C-alpha cells in the first residue's frame, strides 16, 4: 500500500473545536481523504470568557487554552493508533473563527500562544502558528470546501455553488458573481493557480446563531414574552430579527462598514447552506432531514457519502414549518424531535434558539443575500463523506500554496470520496496537484501571508 501523508486542520470555533484529519497519497498526485473528524467542547474562547466548562479556569488564559487543546490532541493521537494512521510529525493547522474574533486582542493572543504550546508538546508538528481567520478567508474556504467536495472547482461559473455558512458567532457567504465590480466590498481575485476566479466572499460578525440570538433578546423593549423565546411566535420573531439585522447593517456593526452592498446571485446558481442551516432544517422537520423537500434535479455532486441528495427547501417552505416550531415549548419541541435528537447536529443547548435561527436564516437569505422565494437552499452536513466545514477548503488552499512556493505544476486534485469513486478536477483551472516529495520540501509550513492565492479587488 502506498504511503499516505497526514495533516490536521483544527477549526477552533465559538462553541467548540473540531479537528479534521486528512491523508494524501500517491507519489505523483495529491489525493485528499478525510479519515475522521472529532469535536471537543467548549471552544477555546471559553478560557477568556470564564465559562464554567472551560478547563483550568483558575489558571491563566494561555494555560487554559493549552490544557483545552492538549485533551483534543491526546484523543487524536489515540485515534491514530486505533485506526493505524501514521500521525507522528503530522502538521497541525489551527485556525480560529468568530469566537476569538470577538475577544479582546490580548486575550486572543494568549489563547493562540497556549494552543501553539499544546501542539509543540504533542507528537504532532507545529509548522504554521495558530491564528485567527479573517472572516473573508473563512468565507473563501467555505466556497473551496463545497466546490472541491462536489467536483466543481474547474467548472464554469454557472455550475459552481454559492455557499452560505452560519456558525455560532458569524455567518458567511461566498460565490462567483456575474460581475466582478470592485464596488462590492468583499470581492477577491483568486490566483491563476486557483483558476483566476473573482469571488464575492464575506463574513458578518455577530450574525451567527448564538450571537444573534443573544443580541435579539437584549434589544427587546416590548411587554410580555419575547416572540423568539419558546413558546413564541414566528412572525413576531422574524420582525425582531429583521430589525436587528437592518440596524447592524446600517451601523456597520458586522465588520463590513455601513450598509454594505451584496452582488446579486447569478440566476440558476445552486445555493448550499452549511452548519446551522442544516441544524435549522433538522429542527424544522422533526429531527429527520429526509422529511424535508429536496430537488431531484439537484447536481449529484452534492450527494452525501452514500449517495443521498441533501434536503433543499425554499424559504416559504421553511417559514411554514417555522410557524409550527416557534409555537412549541422546549419540552414539546423535544417530544416532536423524538429519538432523532441523537443526530450530532441537534444539540440540546441549541434547541432554545431554534426559532431565532430559522428567522435569521430567512431574513439573511431574503433581505441581505437576495435569495428568491423560488430558490431552493440545499443544506448539507457532509458532501461525499467530507464534513460540511471550511476545513477541507483550508487544506486545498494549503496544498495550492505549497505549489506556489515550489513552482510545482500538477494535474489537479483528486478528491477521494468514501464509497464514491474519485473525481479528477480539471488541472488547467486548478493547478494544485503536488508530489508528496514536494510537500515534504515545502515543510507544509509556509504561512498563508507569504503566498496569497487571492487578492482583494
Task: Label the model's feature ranges.
Residues 24:
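Hydrophobic pocket-lining residues within nucleotide cofactor-binding pockets
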Residues 166:
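Calcium-coordinating acidic loop motifs
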Residues 2-10, 14:
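N-terminal module-boundary/linker segments of secreted carbohydrate-active enzymes
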Residues 15, 169:
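Conserved Rossmann-like nucleotide-cofactor binding loop
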Residues 31-39, 88-92:
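Short coil-to-beta-strand
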Residues 27-35, 126, 182:
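Beta-strand initiation motifs
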Amino acid at each position: 500500500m502506498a504511503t499516505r501523508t497526514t495533516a490536521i486542520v483544527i477549526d477552533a470555533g465559538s462553541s467548540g473545536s473540531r479537528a479534521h484529519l486528512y491523508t494524501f497519497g500517491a507519489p505523483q498526485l495529491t489525493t485528499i481523504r478525510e479519515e475522521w473528524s472529532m469535536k471537543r467542547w467548549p471552544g477555546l474562547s471559553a478560557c477568556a470568557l470564564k465559562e464554567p466548562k472551560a478547563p483550568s479556569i483558575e489558571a491563566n488564559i494561555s494555560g487554559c487554552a493549552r490544557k483545552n487543546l492538549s485533551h483534543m490532541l491526546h484523543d487524536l493521537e489515540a485515534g491514530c493508533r486505533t485506526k493505524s494512521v501514521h500521525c507522528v510529525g503530522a502538521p497541525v493547522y489551527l485556525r480560529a473563527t468568530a469566537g476569538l474574533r470577538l475577544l479582546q486582542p490580548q486575550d486572543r493572543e494568549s489563547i493562540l500562544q497556549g494552543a501553539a504550546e499544546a501542539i509543540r508538546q504533542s507528537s504532532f508538528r507545529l509548522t504554521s502558528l495558530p491564528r485567527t481567520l479573517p472572516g473573508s478567508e473563512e468565507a473563501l474556504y467555505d466556497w473551496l470546501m463545497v466546490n472541491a467536495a462536489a467536483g466543481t472547482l474547474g467548472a464554469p461559473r454557472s455550475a459552481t455553488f454559492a455557499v452560505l455558512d452560519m456558525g455560532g458567532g458569524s455567518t458567511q457567504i461566498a460565490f462567483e458573481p456575474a460581475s466582478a465590480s470592485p464596488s462590492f466590498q468583499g470581492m477577491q481575485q483568486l490566483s491563476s493557480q486557483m483558476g483566476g476566479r473573482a469571488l464575492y466572499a464575506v463574513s458578518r460578525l455577530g450574525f451567527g446563531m448564538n450571537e444573534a440570538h443573544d443580541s435579539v433578546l437584549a434589544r427587546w423593549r416590548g411587554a410580555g414574552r419575547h416572540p423568539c423565546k419558546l413558546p413564541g411566535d414566528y412572525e413576531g420573531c422574524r420582525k425582531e430579527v429583521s430589525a436587528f439585522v437592518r440596524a447592524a447593517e446600517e451601523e456597520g456593526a458586522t465588520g463590513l462598514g455601513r450598509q454594505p452592498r451584496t452582488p446579486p446571485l447569478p440566476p440558476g446558481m445552486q445555493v448550499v447552506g452549511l452548519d446551522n442551516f442544516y441544524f435549522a432544517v433538522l429542527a424544522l422537520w422533526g429531527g429527520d432531514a429526509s422529511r424535508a423537500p429536496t430537488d431531484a434535479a439537484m447536481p449529484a455532486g452534492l450527494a452525501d457519502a452514500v449517495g443521498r441528495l441533501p434536503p433543499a427547501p425554499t424559504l416559504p417552505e421553511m417559514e411554514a414549518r417555522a410557524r409550527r416550531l416557534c409555537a412549541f415549548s422546549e419540552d414539546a419541541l423535544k417530544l416532536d424531535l423524538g429519538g432523532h435528537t441523537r443526530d450530532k447536529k441537534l444539540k440540546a443547548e441549541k434547541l432554545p434558539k431554534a426559532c431565532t435561527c430559522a428567522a435569521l436564516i430567512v431574513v439573511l437569505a431574503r433581505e441581505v443575500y437576495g435569495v428568491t422565494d423560488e430558490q431552493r437552499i440545499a443544506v448539507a452536513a457532509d458532501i461525499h463523506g467530507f464534513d460540511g466545514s471550511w476545513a477541507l477548503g483550508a487544506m486545498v488552499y494549503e496544498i495550492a500554496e505549497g505549489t506556489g512556493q515550489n513552482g510545482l505544476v500538477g494535474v489537479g486534485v483528486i478528491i477521494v470520496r468514501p464509497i464514491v469513486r474519485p473525481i479528477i478536477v480539471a488541472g488547467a483551472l486548478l493547478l494544485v496537484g503536488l508530489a508528496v516529495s514536494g510537500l515534504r520540501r515545502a515543510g507544509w509550513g509556509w504561512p498563508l501571508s507569504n503566498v496569497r492565492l487571492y487578492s482583494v479587488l
